[in-house]
Amino acid sequence: MTPEPPAPDTASRDAENLDAAAAQQRLRKLHSKATRLKLDLHDLAEDLPIGWEGLLDVARRTYDAYAEIALLEGLAEKETSR
């Protein structure tokens, strides 16, 4: 059994209403944010057990950023295949 994806946040729900240019701009910002979060998660993991309390929060935000990237890229792919 695969886990259910998290409920989409407001940005994810609004992603379907973006035009192509706005979606590309959003994707660029999300890629930057996701990369920063990935590095934060890596740094936090290196310092374990110090700072373990923040691990789940950073992991969730990283997951959410990459989930939204996947959503936007999937929508962009649908648009180009029409």
Curated annotation (Swiss-Prot):
This is UPF0437 protein in nifX-nifW intergenic region. GO terms for biological process: nitrogen fixation. Belongs to the UPF0437 family. Gene3D superfamilies: Helix hairpin bin. It comes from Frankia alni. Keywords: Nitrogen fixation. Signal peptide: none annotated. The keyword Cell cycle does not apply. Coiled coil: none annotated.
